[in-house]
């Protein structure tokens, strides 16, 4: 079987789309894996760095970039590509990557998913997005469409690369013609990282199964929260049906507060939450995650 695999690599030096897709999936697991490591070891790194930025959210992409750049420097491939025995080469000459291509590859591998993840998180939380953020998200949609087209042309052997990024950098994926030359220290470190990838996949599987067992074994309704008696002046000022408790007008963009159950205008409840951090009616503490947009049909 090993001899047949070697013959295949010699006769056909082009990896299949399944190997490429698997390597991309493994690359995309680095960021959540680092976040899980921080949580598992109890590293209290989730505090504000500047504005809305949090140090854990910004440290993980930086470590991801360092890991990808290390692999691109030593093996001319990303972490996932090296795991599946692939290598990046120049499309026209077949040479390995130069420093500029290594830096650009590591940057695009890390910060494109980072920016897209940030934008999608803001949209999921129904936060207001600026026009340039909307245009940037549209650009990501166009990129994914272009990547799907490149993948199709790669499948029918009409294109030498599977992604617009590879086409932009003038690169393609191939099986290495010879094993990478690296010192003993580098070999040990990279092998430890590959073993860590197996370990992380096992931990993820074990954790998901453990959570499933816990949820399946304790399907008991939680106790009701103690009812807070509202002051008389608050009870008298409660709005009529269909009115926002804050502006006392007809509700626009209805948004429910999961803590109290009241429905407000989106702008009213967000403005009040940012200023006071509580529900306007019950004065229970709330956060942006407690607000649920209601889409009427």
From Swiss-Prot:
Residues 45-48, 120-124, 220-297 are cytoplasmic. It holds the Pfam family Pex2_Pex12. Gene3D superfamilies: Zinc/RING finger domain, C3HC4 (zinc finger). A zinc finger (RING-type) spans 244-283. The gene is Pex12. GO terms for molecular function: protein transmembrane transporter activity; ubiquitin protein ligase activity; ubiquitin-protein transferase activity; zinc ion binding. Residues 1-16, 74-98, 159-191 are peroxisomal matrix. It comes from the Eukaryota. The three subunits of the retrotranslocation channel (PEX2, PEX10 and PEX12) coassemble in the membrane into a channel with an open 10 Angstrom pore. The RING-type zinc-fingers that catalyze PEX5 receptor ubiquitination are positioned above the pore on the cytosolic side of the complex. The RING-type zinc-finger is degenerated and only coordinates one zinc ions, preventing E3 ubiquitin-protein ligase activity. Pathway: Protein modification; protein ubiquitination. It is a multi-pass membrane protein. InterPro entries: PEX12 (IPR017375), Pex_N (IPR006845), Znf_RING/FYVE/PHD (IPR013083). The chain crosses the membrane at residues 17-44, 49-73, 99-119, 125-158, 192-219. Component of a retrotranslocation channel required for peroxisome organization by mediating export of the PEX5 receptor from peroxisomes to the cytosol, thereby promoting PEX5 recycling. The retrotranslocation channel is composed of PEX2, PEX10 and PEX12; each subunit contributing transmembrane segments that coassemble into an open channel that specifically allows the passage of PEX5 through the peroxisomal membrane. PEX12 also regulates PEX5 recycling by activating the E3 ubiquitin-protein ligase activity of PEX10. Keywords: Membrane, Metal-binding, Peroxisome, Protein transport, Transmembrane, Transmembrane helix, Transport, Ubl conjugation pathway, Zinc, Zinc-finger. Belongs to the pex2/pex10/pex12 family. CDD domains: mRING_PEX12. Component of the PEX2-PEX10-PEX12 retrotranslocation channel. This is Peroxisome assembly protein 12. It is found in: Peroxisome membrane. Signal peptide: none annotated.
């Amino acid at each position: 079987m090993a001899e047949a695999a070697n013959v295949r690599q010699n006769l056909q030096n082009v990896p299949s789309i399944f190997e490429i897709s698997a390597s991309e999936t493994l690359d995309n697991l680095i960021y959540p894996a680092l976040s899980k490591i921080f949580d598992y070891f109890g590293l209290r790194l989730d505090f504000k760095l500047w504005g809305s930025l949090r140090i854990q959210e910004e440290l993980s992409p930086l470590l991801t970039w360092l890991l990808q750049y290390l692999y691109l420097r030593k093996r001319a491939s990303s972490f996932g590509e090296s795991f599946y025995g692939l290598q990046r080469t120049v499309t026209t000459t077949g040479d390995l990557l130069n420093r500029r291509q290594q830096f650009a590859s590591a940057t695009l591998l890390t910060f494109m998913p980072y920016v897209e993840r940030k934008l999608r998180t803001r949209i999921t939380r129904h936060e207001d997005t600026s026009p340039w953020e909307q245009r940037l998200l549209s650009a990501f949609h166009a990129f994914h469409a272009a990547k799907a087209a490149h993948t199709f042309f790669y499948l029918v052997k009409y294109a030498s690369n599977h992604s617009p990024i590879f086409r932009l950098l003038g690169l393609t994926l191939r099986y290495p013609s010879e094993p990478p030359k690296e010192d003993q220290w580098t070999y040990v470190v990279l092998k430890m990282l590959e073993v860590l990838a197996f370990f992380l996949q096992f931990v993820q599987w074990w954790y998901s199964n453990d959570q499933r067992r816990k949820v399946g074994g304790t399907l008991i309704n939680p106790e009701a929260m103690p009812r807070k008696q509202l002051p008389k002046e608050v009870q008298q000022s409660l709005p009529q049906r269909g009115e926002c408790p804050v502006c006392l007008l007809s509700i626009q963009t209805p948004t429910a507060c999961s803590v109290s159950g009241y429905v407000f205008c989106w702008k009213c409840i967000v403005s009040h939450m940012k200023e006071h951090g509580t529900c306007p009616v019950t004065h229970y503490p709330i956060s942006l995650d407690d607000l649920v947009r209601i889409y009427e049909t």
